[in-house]
């Protein structure tokens, strides 16, 4: 569906992913480098979580969808099933910004019909829409993990509930 100015309307799934990313950043607000390096087993370090979500977005939206891998280091330090690592929060946030910036350009250009198209291999057989949903829900899983780690570390002023969803990413059918 196009907007009045002729530009494509961003699919609701993409809006929800963008809102979820903003909530994830809110969960990270106030986390310092030293705390992000700590690993309270069996949980991951916060630095790893940041890299891991960048890794997943890169894998789905850049490597598979566009055949580019701008931050190959993520495959080494934050891939699913890899050994536990404790990468620098600063480095992983920089990688996350690079990956999500590139992914956003692609996601923002997707017409709604593209969400039903298959995401190219390698990886699970899934549509682009399935991949966006999986990434979105994966963020929420790790938001909970980050907040649990922060609680164990005694961090005050943690987010306690979902932010302003109805204003920033309200429901719409198309």
Task: Tell me the role of every PLM-derived stretch.
Residues 1-13, 81-85:
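Short, charged, low-complexity loops and linkers
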Residues 2, 14-21, 25, 33-79, ...:
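Short, contiguous alpha-helical
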Residues 17, 21, 28, 96, ...:
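Hydrophobic alpha-helical core bundles mediating ligand binding, dimerization, or RNAP-core interactions
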Residues 30-37, 105-116, 152-156:
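Surface-exposed helix-capping loop/turn segments at secondary-structure junctions
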Residues 80-120, 126-140:
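Acidic/histidine-rich alpha-helical segments that form the ligand environment
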